[in-house]
A protein has these predicted regions:
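Short beta-alpha junctions and helix-cap segments that line functional grooves
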Residues: 21, 48, 64-66, 107-111
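Short Gly/Pro-enriched turn/cap motifs at secondary-structure boundaries
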Residues: 40-43, 67-70, 84-86, 112-119
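Residue-level signal for inorganic ion chemistry
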Residues: 14, 63, 95, 125, ...
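A short, Trp-centered hydrophobic/proline-enriched beta-strand micro-motif
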Residues: 28-36
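A short core secondary-structure module
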Residues: 62-106
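Glycine-rich beta->alpha junctions and the first turn(s) of the following alpha-helix
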Residues: 104-175
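A structural signal for short hydrophobic beta-strand segments in well-ordered beta-sheet cores
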Residues: 50-53
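Internal helix-loop-helix
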Residues: 1-29, 69-76, 87-88
Length: 175
């Protein structure tokens, strides 16, 4: 979680969000996830259907996500949601949701072939209310933020896969 979620809070979070969450991420007190993928939309970040509607001082989130790494055990989730569904990619925003927020359900743990130590799950949001201060960066900039951070995330995952493959090859040769 420190390679994937922490950079979003570090780069786009307010000073208050950084002070509240980054120490908890570093200490391991909180487990985090980022909720992008949706049933029916896959990883098409412009086609996200989850919405976050501003209601006074809160955003009200509705929608669902699937194949979310760390989703089952996460205490804190970055949710990719449409704050302006008519604006396409420019209507996408990122919001922090704590797992104990009413209306948030972590669903079931999904079965996987590999990486069994890392959970993957569905997430459901039904009238989940979060303070508007939980918005990362500016409303409507979420897609741009994702495009900025995803290359580093993908590189981190690729390096881990390559290191695992090299280790497996070496263990095989040694055997």
């Amino acid at each position: 979680h420190s390679d994937i979620v922490a950079p979003y809070i570090l780069h786009y979070g307010s000073e208050a969000l950084k002070h509240k969450y980054l120490p908890q991420l570093i200490s391991g007190e909180r487990v985090t996830a980022i909720a992008m993928t949706e049933p029916g939309a896959g990883s098409d970040l412009q086609g996200v259907k989850t919405t976050a509607v501003l209601d006074g001082d809160e955003y009200v989130i509705n929608g669902s996500k699937t194949f979310i790494t760390n989703g089952f055990l996460a205490d804190l989730v970055i949710v990719v949601a449409k704050t302006d569904p008519k604006a396409g990619a420019k209507g996408t925003s990122l919001l922090l949701v704590e797992a104990d927020t009413p209306g948030f359900d972590q669903g079931k743990r999904l079965e996987k072939v590999g990486m069994k130590a890392q959970d993957t799950s569905e997430l459901f949001f039904q009238d989940v209310r979060v303070p508007k201060e939980n918005l990362l960066g500016q409303a409507g900039m979420g897609f741009a933020y994702l495009m900025q951070e995803l290359p580093q995330e993908r590189l981190t995952v690729a390096i881990g896969a390559l290191a695992s493959a090299e280790a497996a090859l070496q263990w095989t040769l040694d055997y």
